[in-house]
């Protein structure tokens, strides 16, 4: 089949679920991964043909709403290809800002940096900062054995790969005796009541344990991370956490009341309140 025809037909199959623009983007990702084509191949090479039968099963999965990243088995993040599958949250582009802020801070230091990644999931944050900071020591923590298996088996060869441990940050007294220069986290923060307004490609496929917090305890993970940071963060260390865009002021006040200094909100590329940055007080 001509690539141009394949793009048109396949996009049409997904348009009802995603809208035309997002459907086209998904099909372009599929074609790039499976056929090695670019966004413009069908224009510069009008006679270019593709073996459409080889992706028929994957198209059916996409039609059912399965995320393209799970279908392909990978997601692009921080310029690298991460293994993803059901059981770990798919990395989002906005989370790259958290990594960039952490790397920028760490590069100001001349010593070895100790970094903790809470709710590590696929390990995309842990691996990204470890790759950019070859002299760092990175530990990732997650409650899910499935997520930890995915994180541990990312295919990167770097001098100091992250280590990963199982832990429940809400109940476990993790990493007693350790101190960290950086504590990073992308914890669950979506209100359970928001689920009804979300796309089914998220709600039906990505792990609920990595997404949702109870409506009556929206700051449950923020509280736990603040308490852990009081115990595990070095005096001159900082924390960066991804947050719910509508709860920024509440989270900011929580950390201020815990006597953290230099607390501030960082916006994402869409000008939404997406992260909080904080540092230990000198007391």
Where do the PLM segments sit?
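Conserved beta-strand segments of alpha/beta enzyme cores
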Residues: 81, 137, 161-163, 261-264
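Conserved AdoMet
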Residues: 29-105
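Conserved hydrophobic residues forming the short capping helix/wall of the S-adenosyl-L-methionine
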Residues: 14, 106, 155, 229, ...
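Mobile active-site "lid"/loop adjacent to the S-adenosyl-L-methionine
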Residues: 189-221
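Residue-level signal for inorganic ion chemistry
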Residues: 30, 65, 95, 125, ...
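Non-catalytic accessory regions of SAM-dependent methyltransferases
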Residues: 1-43
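Conserved SAM/SAH cofactor-binding pocket of Class I
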Residues: 97-197, 224
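Conserved Class I SAM-dependent methyltransferase catalytic core
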Residues: 215-279
